[in-house]
A protein has these predicted regions:
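A cross-family glycoside hydrolase active-site/sugar-binding cleft signature
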Residues: 1-3, 27, 135
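Catalytic PLP-binding core of fold-type I/II PLP enzymes
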Residues: 1-14, 46
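A secondary-structure boundary/capping signal
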Residues: 4, 29-30, 86-89
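Short clusters of hydrophobic/aromatic residues that line enzyme substrate/ligand-binding pockets
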Residues: 8, 17, 34, 74, ...
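PLP-dependent aminotransferase class I/II
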Residues: 11, 47-140
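Structural detector of well-ordered beta-strand residues that form the stable sheet scaffold
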Residues: 1, 25, 117-119
Length: 140
């Protein structure tokens, strides 16, 4: 399981983060690049996705009666309004990433002649700049 909680839209060695494990978890908590106020999503293959959907929707199985469950399940669904908020933001993700990248460039420029060093992307990485960090060498 890959923890991609904060890396939506980032790349490592040319691959999307969230694509390295059999399953990855992305957070939509209130402070993330995309938010639904909580919850998140998993990234996986179709078979694993169907299994996860079954378990997270109370393990109901199709049946003429309303409440037939074939195993213990959970109610981990987002309310529809939260899901709609997330979908609308996902449609804007490229623009959000571009704005975050531009802002990081401004921080880098503003800090270049100060005692602070902007922590930039390592080689082979493309950050979503969800958070930005600096190092204050004179204070280490």
């Amino acid at each position: 399981v890959e923890d991609a909680a904060e890396s939506l839209g980032s790349f490592y060695q040319g691959r999307h983060t969230g694509s390295f494990g059999k399953l990855a978890a992305v957070s939509f908590n209130g402070n993330k690049i995309i938010t639904t106020g909580g919850g998140g999503m998993i990234l996986c293959d179709a078979e694993t996705g169907q299994r996860a959907k079954h378990l997270t929707t109370t393990a109901k199985k199709p049946h003429p009666y309303e409440y037939v469950h074939d195993e213990v399940g959970f109610n981990y669904r987002l309310p529809n309004i939260n899901a709609a908020l997330g979908v609308a933001q996902m449609e804007q993700l490229p623009e959000v990433l571009a704005e975050k990248r531009a802002l990081a460039g401004e921080y880098r420029q503003l800090l270049k002649d100060t005692e602070f060093q902007f922590v930039d992307e390592p080689d082979g990485c493309r950050s979503n700049f969800w958070l930005n960090a600096t190092v204050a060498f004179d204070h280490i």
